[in-house]
Amino acid sequence: MKNNLTFFVFIVIGIFSVTAAAPNWGVADTLEHYEIGPGIEYIKIRYESVPLTLWATTIDMTNPYNVIEQVQSNNSVPDLKRELVQDMSKRLTTPGHKVCAAFNHDFFSYDEGVCIGLNISNGVISMPAGSGRSTFAITQDKTASVFFPVPECKAISASGDEVTIDHFNWGAETIRNGDCVLFTNMNSLNLDADGRYIKIRPRSNWIVNGTPTVCDVLEVSDLPLQTSDTDFVLYLRNTKLNSLPDIKVGEEITISQKLVAGKFGTPPDNILQAFHGYPSIAYEGKLHDGEYNDFENGREYETSCRTMAGMSQDGKTVYFVATELSENSTGINCIDIANWMLAHGAWNVVNFDSGGSTAIVVDHTMLNLPGRGSLRPVMDGVLLVSTAPEDNGVAHYSFSKTQLNVPIISLAPLTLISQNKYKDVIERNVEVEGFAFRCEPAELGWVDKGAVFHAGETVMSGKIIAEKNGITAELPVSTRPVQDIHIAADEILIDSVRPYRINLEGNINGQVYTLDPAAFAWTSSNPSCCRIENGILKGIENGETSLVGTLDTITVGLKVIVEVTPETLVHENFSDLSDFPLFSTVSNTLSISHEELPTGWPDGAVLQFDQKTGRNPYVEMGKSYRLYSLPDSISLQLNLSKEALAAIKHIRFDFTHKNGKSYWQPEYIPSDTGDQTIAWAFSKNGIAFPTEDFPLTLDRIRFVLNPGSRSEITIPLRELKAYYPVKASSAINNVHIENNFAWITAEGELRLHYNLQQTGSADISIWTTAGQQISEYISNRELPGTYTYNIPDRFLSPGIYILTIRANGKKQSLKFRVK
């Protein structure tokens, strides 16, 4: 069954800028677009022609219930262990402080365990290593700005003595800058160097470029003192060993943290959070000449997955963009991302870490596939936080997109999200039971009980309205003309049990869409053999009919063959052996007869042969059987002696589908003697073979032999029998197979295949065997059918992994190996 995502018009994420042109990436498919928190919009976009998957998050800083925070891994400097972004998100979510989204941030030194530039967390400079190339700052009044950072920080005693602070915290090994160092409450080192130590405790919150922070002096010592969650340590040595000579316990000391103007930009007052931006990529609405093109080793042209940040001209809207590097998403350079951001509202753009560090996390789950081989813990991150009070009361429903743009007479599953009064998400993929849907105008289409939108026949604009418990959600809709409307198959075989939706397709600019057969008026040349309702066929009695569907001037046709199903049907009882072709690569005495049947067998036949030594040894029964109707399984009874068991390596059935091409070759390996039944279901891991592939034909049964020479091998056979469903829900016979709905194939590339038995979504996660989640993918709501997900094995380190999938109200776990 062919299934296709519907393409939607991209809704831009801010005020358009006319100073930059977005890269020519083709049509944008907006997969998701909704608020994930107060004033925090989340958008997932797909550019199929690149191909590229991009996430854009927009923060309205005027909303009183959101903040942006810089956080150090494990709240430690240095931190050689580092921390996954999703773990930062979980760790720092508390009542009234809900992390809605998180991103990786700065480049870092593995050996030193520190970021490479100046960062500020809640008003405290964590590490000014080299200060860096640019700073993306957020002030106390929630205004963003970008500038070149030049620190000027001091400690001032009560008597007016002062000393310049050269550095904040130290790295793990060799970073030992400055003779005056302020070790903050993020310090993770055990301080042991010679010098003077002054332990201080702040009386108020910290701020940069604001009122200096007054602290109490707790201890003064020539021996090392240690920091804590509440206490900082000012360390003096060498040229500054005797600075602040009169400082005493019980006095106050003032810490002034300032950033002054450098080569570009003006540092604002009252900075609470700041992020090192490495080179400034775009500044004041255009690429920042002398900065973006002064990236070491030409890294501005390096293609990779990446995270970048931007702000609007007034600093009141902030943007974060992340991309994926995977089998389905190519690497992009920072210039293209910056131009895309400029074209969609950004004024200034800076570059965060890229490659394997890139991470976007929503609801504590990493959405992008890890680049460069595996999950990478990072040194710091960006948190988008809701500070709204906890509230689980549903006040809003939203659709997962802000605009639906689909062809006429198409089918589009709808997804609803519930939010509280602050716009914090309560539930994604809300159950649609209890919702009332309507379309305005009515000619726009209709929504069925499974929340699938059936687009009308006329090109128009309107909206879908969903309502439950007096709460409504609206989705603007535009429909478009579609070309080349046709049925995917010219002829179809159906039974009297399973309904079949006519597979109607059309395309727009080469993109194929699933269309709604219920939009057509259908006539049948033989209505007694099957009926059709809303484009769905149901067989009644054996026969053939020609269906004609009409919509205005469009006409489509389909030949339908109905074969009513019995419960079972014996296709071969071996009563007539007059036309039974046999073949062998290693036997000249091959025969089949009714002689010497096993005791208790009323019928059947015995295959007999001698085996001589030879390559590729096998014996083959070449009689062909066109299987009646749509069986769900097939069986063959046989009886094996010790000699036959030793001779047989495996038994293979060769099936072809209706077009005569090789289709399926299941193998059975016998393990015991005596009566036994080979049984196979016409399915793959519980998923019935597509109706379009029937009828199936069993072309041959091959007994593949173990090498050697043997004489008088006999294999009794009886009843090649097909089994049929007796009701639609029993299309697969559970006697013969497990009730799975997903499976992995490894022919060339690792792929997950899964079957949706009803309209819905699939939640797919990849885990290490140690229980660490690597990635999560949640599909859009899709129509019933079989879908494929490409497993990103080439981006994973060698080893065993576990894939979990939730769909159809069930969970299934599968293992796979990366070599």
Where in this protein do the model-derived segments appear?
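Residue-level detector of functionally pivotal "anchor" positions at catalytic/ligand-binding pockets or at interdomain
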Residues: N392, Y723-E747, Q757
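Gly/Ser/Thr/Pro-rich low-complexity, intrinsically disordered segments
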Residues: A21-S525, C529-T568, I701
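Extracellular carbohydrate-recognition regions
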Residues: E563-T589
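Short carbohydrate-recognition loop motifs
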Residues: S593-P617
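Extracellular ligand-binding interfaces
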Residues: Q611-P690, R710-P716, V726
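Short, glycine-anchored, charge-dense loop/turn motifs used at functional sites
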Residues: W767-I774, Y801
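Glycine-centered tight-turn motifs at strand-turn-strand junctions
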Residues: G674, Q773-L796, G809-K810
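C-terminal tail/sorting-segment detector
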Residues: N733-H736, E776, P798-K819
